[in-house]
């Protein structure tokens, strides 16, 4: 009888250890999945910082320079008579 009780106790302890191990594995897998999602979000933010923001800045700055060149730096267009005189 004592031997049977010891086997039952070992069985229950083994079941508890198995349940704890399964819970730990599930917890590790869930934490790894959430960490990978967080990493993806951080990489998207990094992509925004390194690629999107500078390209928007370059686009806006080049548009400003284009307007500045057309309004202030570029000489006025020549009339047809002036072109003929310059070619002669």
UniProtKB/Swiss-Prot annotation:
Homopentamer. Interacts with membrane protein M in the budding compartment of the host cell, which is located between endoplasmic reticulum and the Golgi complex. Interacts with Nucleoprotein. GO terms for cellular component: host cell Golgi membrane; membrane. Residues 1-16 are virion surface. Belongs to the betacoronaviruses E protein family. Residues 38-79 are intravirion. One of its GO terms (biological process) is viral budding from Golgi membrane. InterPro entries: E_protein_bCoV, E_protein_CoV. Plays a central role in virus morphogenesis and assembly. Acts as a viroporin and self-assembles in host membranes forming pentameric protein-lipid pores that allow ion transport. Also plays a role in the induction of apoptosis. Keywords: Apoptosis, Host Golgi apparatus, Host membrane, Membrane, Transmembrane, Transmembrane helix. It holds the Pfam family CoV_E. The chain crosses the membrane at residues 17-37. It is a single-pass type III membrane protein. It is found in: Host Golgi apparatus membrane. This is Envelope small membrane protein. PROSITE patterns: COV_E. It comes from Rat coronavirus (strain 681) (RCV-SDAV). It comes from the Viruses.
């Amino acid at each position: 009888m004592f031997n049977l009780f010891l086997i039952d106790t070992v069985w229950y302890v083994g079941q508890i250890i198995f349940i704890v191990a399964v819970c730990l594995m599930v917890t590790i897998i869930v934490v790894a999945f959430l960490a990978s999602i967080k990493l993806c979000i951080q990489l998207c933010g990094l992509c925004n910082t390194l690629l999107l923001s500078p390209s928007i800045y370059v686009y806006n700055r080049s548009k400003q320079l284009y307007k500045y060149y057309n309004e202030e730096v570029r000489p006025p267009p020549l009339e047809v008579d002036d072109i003929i005189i310059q070619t002669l």
